[in-house]
Regions:
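Rieske [2Fe-2S] iron-sulfur-binding domain
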Residues: 1-98
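C-terminal catalytic domain of Rieske-type non-heme iron oxygenases
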Residues: 69-379
Length: 379
C-alpha cells in the first residue's frame, strides 16, 4: 500500500509553486521556474545543471519539499496540524469520533470521495457560516421555498407509490404538530440519541429523525418506488452488521457535526464535507465534497447525487439561501456603524424542559463554539 504525504507547495530552490493543478496523478513534480524535480514523497530527484553547484550541494541538507508538522488519520479522515506539540488527533476529536464512526460504517468496505466538488466565495466573516450550520431557527423561513417544493413532490410521490401498491402510511402527517413533536422526541430517546450536545474541544452536533428520506437505507415517497427494495435490503444488512439500535440511529436520523474550528459534516440528503477558510474579515472561501459507500450501486449513487444536489448543491434549494442570509447579515453589520450590540444566541437558556428543544429550538450548540473561540483568544 502507498503512503499519504502532505507537502508545502513550495520549491526549496527559489520558492516557486511545484504543483499548479488542483488534482490529478503524477509520479514526479517539476517546478516550472527552474525545473527542479521532486518525487511524490517530496524527495529531490533532479537538479538541472547540477554541476554548476558546489560539490556535495545536494547533500548539505535536505532539499526536498517540506512536510507539514503533523498528519494524522481517523477512519479515513485526514487532518493536518501545524502545531507539532498539539494533542493527538484521537484526543482532539473527543466525542466527534462516534459520529465519524457512524458515517464510515454506512459502508461495508469503506467510503470514497465522489469526483468533483464545489468551491465558492461568501462575502461574510467565516464564523457566520459556523453559526448558520448550527442554527435551528432559520430553516423554515430561509428555506421556505424548499419546504413548499418538498410538499408538492411528496404528494405526487405518495400517489404514485400507492398506485404501484407501496404503502405510504408511515409518511402521513394528519397528527397535530404537538403529537408529531412528541413522537420525534420519543424516537430520539428510544435510540438513546441526544438532540443536541457538546462533543468536547469545541465540537458539537445535533440529530433529528429524517423527514425527507436518506439515500442510505431509508426510502421516501418523494423518490421512485423502484428504489425501495434495494434501500430496504441495505437497511437489513446494516442491522445484521451493527445491531438494530445503532442501525436505526445511522439510517433514520440526520446528523449535523461541526468539528472546531471550521469543518462541517452534514449527513442528511447525502454526506457533505465542508470547510470554510477566512480570506479576510469579510470574506471566506467555502469548499465542499460529498462521499459515498464504495460498493454503492449505480442506481443508488444516482439517487444520492440527486438528493445531495437538490438541497446542498451550489444551485440547490439550501446553499444559495444560506449564502444570501449570511451575506445580508454581514452587510447589516457593516452598514450599522453605530450599532454596538451582539449576536443574540440566548435561546435554550429558559428553564430546562425536555420538550423545549423539540418545540422551540436551542442555540446552545452555537454557545459551544463561541465558548471555545473565546478560550483560544484568551490564551
Amino acid at each position: 500500500a502507498g503512503q499519504v504525504h502532505v507537502l508545502y507547495n513550495l520549491c526549496t530552490h527559489r520558492g516557486g509553486r511545484v504543483c499548479r493543478e488542483k488534482s490529478g496523478k503524477a509520479s514526479v513534480f517539476q517546478c516550472f521556474y527552474h525545473g527542479w524535480v521532486f518525487g511524490s514523497d517530496g524527495g529531490l530527484r533532479l537538479i538541472p545543471q547540477e554541476g554548476a553547484y558546489p560539490a556535495g550541494y545536494r547533500n548539505e541538507r535536505d532539499r526536498g519539499l517540506v512536510s507539514v508538522p503533523r498528519l494524522e488519520n481517523y477512519r479515513g479522515f485526514w487532518f493536518i496540524n501545524l502545531d507539532a506539540s498539539a494533542m493527538s488527533l484521537f484526543d482532539y476529536l473527543a466525542g466527534a469520533k462516534e459520529y465519524l464512526d457512524d458515517i464510515v460504517d454506512q459502508s461495508e468496505i469503506g467510503m470514497a470521495i465522489v469526483p468533483g466538488g464545489q468551491n465558492f466565495q461568501v462575502d461574510a466573516n467565516w464564523k457566520l457560516w459556523h453559526e448558520n450550520g448550527m442554527d435551528p431557527f432559520h430553516v423554515h423561513s430561509v428555506h421556505a421555498t424548499y419546504f413548499e417544493y418538498s410538499a408538492d413532490v411528496l404528494k405526487v410521490g405518495k400517489e404514485k407509490a400507492q398506485a404501484s401498491g407501496v404503502s405510504t402510511e408511515a409518511f402521513d402527517t394528519k397528527a397535530s404538530a404537538e403529537v408529531m413533536m412528541k413522537g420525534r422526541y420519543a424516537a430520539l430517546m428510544q435510540t438513546k440519541t441526544k438532540l443536541s450536545f457538546d462533543l468536547g474541544n469545541g465540537h458539537m452536533a445535533y440529530n433529528y429523525p429524517s423527514t425527507h428520506g436518506r439515500p442510505f437505507a431509508q426510502w421516501h415517497p418523494s423518490w421512485d418506488a423502484r428504489y425501495k427494495p434495494e434501500l430496504d435490503q441495505l437497511y437489513d444488512k446494516l442491522v445484521a452488521r451493527v445491531g438494530p439500535e445503532r442501525a436505526r440511529r445511522i439510517a433514520h436520523f440526520d446528523h449535523h457535526i461541526l468539528i472546531f474550528p471550521n469543518l462541517a459534516i452534514v449527513d442528511n440528503h447525502g454526506i457533505m464535507i465542508r470547510t470554510y477558510f477566512s480570506k479576510k474579515p469579510e470574506e471566506m472561501l467555502v469548499q465542499s465534497w460529498t462521499i459515498a459507500p464504495k460498493e454503492e450501486s449505480a442506481e443508488i449513487r444516482k439517487l444520492r447525487l440527486y438528493s445531495y444536489m437538490d438541497f446542498l448543491g451550489p444551485a440547490g434549494f439550501g446553499t444559495p439561501d444560506d449564502v444570501e442570509a449570511i451575506e445580508a447579515a454581514q452587510r447589516g453589520y457593516k452598514g450599522a456603524e453605530d450599532y454596538d450590540g451582539w449576536n443574540d444566541i440566548s435561546a435554550g437558556l429558559a428553564p430546562k424542559d425536555p420538550m423545549n428543544f423539540v418545540k422551540h429550538g436551542d442555540e446552545g450548540r452555537m454557545r459551544v463554539f463561541w465558548t471555545k473561540w473565546q478560550e483560544y483568544l484568551s490564551n
